[in-house]
Amino acid sequence: DKEGIPFVGRAGQLLDKMLESINLNRDNVYITNVINFRTPDNRKPSSEEIERYLPYLTKHIEIISPKILLLLGSTALNTLIGDKIVISEARGKWVEKQIGNCKLFVITSFHPAFLIRQPDQKKMSWIDLKMIRKKIFELKIKID
């Protein structure tokens, strides 16, 4: 909240390294959260909070109109893909999804905060990142 930007601290530093590993950075991607504020005690957002902010998230996606969407963590996955989906089963798989008026390719991976707590899972995220790099190439997306 002090910084006013998503993914700061150790999780943000790890996210920056993850992006850099596939030749991306915060200047050529758009990063946001499911809700636009930090919950008390950094708890998982309630269903009411998610429902209240989902129209804003959808509008962000429509405005940015990305070709690829990377969901980091179960909150993003369950909000945008489905609430019964388990991240360990969903990660590393492409899904074509319509969000608002935007049709895009969606892939899920582990949240950087989870990877800090479970560093053995970084190898799975590396696989996901390589899939993103490949999809960028396949879709001929120009990165500035």
Predicted stretch roles:
Residues 1-144:
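A polyanion-binding, active-site-adjacent surface
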